[in-house]
Amino acid sequence: MLLALCTCFLWLSTTDLWTVQAKDPDTDVSPRTPHRDLAPNNVDFAFILYRHLVASLPGKNVFISPVSISMALAMLSLGARGYTRVQLLQGLGFNLTKLSEAEIHQGFRHLRHLFEKESDTMLEMAMGNALFLDRNLELLESFLADTKHYYEAEALAADFKDGAGASRQINEYIKNKTQGKIVDLVSKLDSSAMLILVNYIFFKGTWEHPFDPESTRQENFYVNKTTVVRVPMMFQSGTIKYLHDRVLPCQLVQLEYLGNGTVFFVLPEEGKMDTVIAALSRDTIQRWSESLTTGQVNLYVPRVVISGAYDLRAILGDMGIADLFDKEADFSGITREAPLKLSKVVHKAVLQLDEKGLEAATCPRVMLEGASEPLTFRFDRPFVLMIFDHFSWSSLFLGKVVNPN
């Protein structure tokens, strides 16, 4: 999870998480900073995208980083013109009569800087975007400058006529950027491709209260009525925030990474996964956050490395963001040469979920004296995983874990 410096002070509004106020002298986080205007739109887009992806992959694991996808598509809009640009920004949830394009890009720039500032030795994260374009295209200097200024992104020439070679180039680029954490992102590419957008993120955080590795045991995970797999099940016991939801058929716990990371583990009742996912929204997260109880809990969570790799073209089309893939797309802000359309939007997110905390600096969980018998939360069947950066309430990750293996 994204981590804040120890000098941070945070005030969480009880009326609206998405206008959360914070103050940090190093990150200049204040109620009027640009990224705050993006938060509601980013979260709404996140849940819409997540539901479309889950619906397209029934019975499968799903794992995405919505905020990094939003950032990648907003970056692409710098080179879009006319209806292509309007459709793209509106598809991301932005009302262009209330938020100017300059404010959108400045907001993402500030958000990116915030993520970088919040990172330190307790966090391992690699996040970025890149455009790969036909090597014969001459790119506009203004586009290259803007993508660098706002998004720290690169536009690279590729020989798509050599599909295998272009794939190797992209995979090697991502491998180097993630120090080998993400490999083999794309396979052989179509020789007719001219523009590919690549977005990637790897994350490994540090628990505020770590799990004890000696307590991890091999246990059953019930994928469905006929499939059971063995998984390393982590365990911790102590005071934990939890909720038995009376509105939706689920229960959940909230854990914290050191710094700014808030993690929701959501366990739907058997057969109710679709009902819970359909109800995910800003209002639902708001209600959960306000309704959590702190109590004695025995918590069991699988140790996993979860990842998701997707070409988002079809999903974005279903969401009404289709013009950028059409031969009539207007990317004249990228090049003034031959008409250009987007061939692929490739996204990969990887999360390492293990026992580790900051061993020397982290206090163990406290068992309250005279407390009642601990409640048990055992995530041994499909569950929903959500990770937010609670400075910006950006949706870093949304996942559906069907099979941890």
UniProtKB/Swiss-Prot annotation:
Q: What is its main location?
A: secreted
Coiled-coil stretches noted in the UniProt entry, renumbered to this chain: none
- What gene name is listed for this protein? Serpina6
Role noted for this protein: Major transport protein for glucocorticoids and progestins in the blood of almost all vertebrate species.
Q: What is known of its domains?
A: Proteolytic cleavage leads to an important conformation change. This reduces the affinity for steroids.
Designated name of the protein: Corticosteroid-binding globulin
Q: Which GO terms describe its cellular component?
A: extracellular space
Q: Could you list this entry's UniProt keywords, alphabetically sorted.
A: Glycoprotein, Lipid-binding, Secreted, Signal, Steroid-binding, Transport
Judging by the UniProt lineage, the source's domain of life is: Eukaryota
Q: Which SMART domains match?
A: SERPIN (SM00093)
Q: Which source organism does the UniProt entry give?
A: Ursus arctos (Brown bear)
Q: Where is this site: Conserved cysteine within steroid binding domain?
A: C250
Q: Which family does it belong to?
A: Belongs to the serpin family.
| Keyword set includes Ribonucleoprotein | no
Q: GO MF annotations for this entry?
A: serine-type endopeptidase inhibitor activity; steroid binding
Q: Does the keyword Heme apply?
A: no
Question: What residue range is the signal peptide?
Answer: 1-22
Protein residues bound to cortisol: Q254, Q286, W393
